[in-house]
């Protein structure tokens, strides 16, 4: 691996870990790195003069996007939600997608330790879907070139139909679904596959939020009447709160629209804390009354 420049100002500006309580449960937003994707693709039909005010593009029209994972101290054990990109990919891939996840250990590992745990403490890894920027850190490349699960003592949780869909490998999806991110988990027999909405363990509920992919899921953390929702790519940044602000990457944008509509209805009624996986600045917030933005909640 060639020498890489130091972290960008965007990455340097992200605290490695931010923590807070949801009722009696404690959650940690762990910054697993940064990527840069085309701003037009990230905002779909929204005109550039509108989205560029919120997240300015670089000279290649890419915008910085966090790779924000969630660590949950649940009664049933430590749960990690999503894993970032990891560090398996080559220089060409990292250049195209502007990936920053320097060195060994990975930032995800560093973040887990900064939250007071060891990677081996993770008992479940929930994957909202299997795109490379969510499932890439689920596996790693060993010194001899083999690819293995990064959390061999954990069960990996995904919607069963998402895993089936990821193996279809058609031209539209093959750049996002990279088999080396999930096939080693199958080889190690570490999957815990779910179907639809399920209570994973006390305080953690998985809910379908399709549109970005047909079997995308979001994660609810529920305790003492309080709820946090890890949205993942149904709403990747706080700038995507408005219903029609939908990514060009979404396979079924009108389904995304309805997923967001249903989530926002509950988020307003129940005053959810919304957790944004890719927002380069805002880790979480509460939906405003018009469902057009969020107000910041905590650090």
Which positions does each model-derived feature cover?
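Short Gly/Pro-enriched turn/cap motifs at secondary-structure boundaries
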Residues: 9, 17, 59-63, 207-212
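Residue-level marker for buried hydrophobic side chains located in beta-strands
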Residues: 79-81, 126, 156, 228-230, ...
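Active-site metal-binding loops of divalent metal-dependent hydrolases
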Residues: 32-33, 83-86, 130, 161-162, ...
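Conserved beta-strand hairpin/beta-sheet module of binuclear metal-dependent hydrolase folds
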Residues: 17-114, 218-233
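Metal-dependent catalytic neighborhoods of phosphoester/phosphodiester hydrolases
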Residues: 135-146, 286-288
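Cap/insert and terminal regions of metallo-dependent hydrolase folds
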Residues: 98-110, 224-299
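Metallo-beta-lactamase
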Residues: 3-6, 100-117, 121-133, 143, ...
């Amino acid at each position: 691996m060639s020498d890489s420049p130091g972290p960008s100002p965007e990455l340097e500006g992200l605290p490695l870990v931010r923590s807070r309580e949801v009722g009696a449960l404690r959650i940690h937003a762990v910054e697993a790195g940064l990527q840069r994707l085309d701003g037009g693709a990230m905002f779909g039909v929204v005109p550039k003069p509108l989205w560029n005010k919120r997240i300015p593009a670089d000279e290649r029209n890419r915008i910085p996007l966090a790779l924000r994972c969630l660590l949950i101290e649940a009664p049933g054990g430590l749960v990690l939600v999503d894993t970032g990109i990891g560090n398996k990919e080559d220089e060409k891939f990292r250049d195209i997608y502007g990936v920053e996840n320097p060195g060994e250990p990975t930032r995800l590992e560093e973040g887990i330790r900064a939250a007071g745990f060891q990677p081996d403490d993770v008992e479940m890894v929930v994957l909202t879907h299997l795109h490379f920027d969510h499932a890439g850190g689920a596996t790693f490349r060993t010194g001899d070139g083999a690819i293995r699960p990064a959390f061999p003592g954990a069960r990996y949780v995904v919607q069963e139909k998402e895993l089936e869909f990821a193996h279809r490998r058609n031209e539209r999806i093959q750049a996002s679904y990279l088999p080396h991110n999930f096939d080693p988990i199958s080889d190690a027999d570490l999957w815990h596959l779910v179907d639809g909405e399920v209570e994973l363990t006390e305080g953690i509920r998985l809910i379908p939020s399709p549109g970005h992919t047909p079997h995308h899921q979001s994660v609810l953390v529920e305790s003492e009447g309080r709820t946090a929702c890890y949205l993942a790519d149904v709403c990747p940044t706080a700038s995507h709160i408005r219903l029609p602000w939908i990514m060009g990457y979404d396979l079924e944008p009108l389904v995304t629209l309805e997923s967001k509509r249903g989530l926002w209805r509950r988020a307003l009624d129940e005053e959810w804390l919304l957790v944004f996986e890719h927002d380069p600045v805002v880790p979480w917030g509460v939906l405003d009354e018009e469902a057009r933005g969020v107000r910041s909640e905590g650090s």
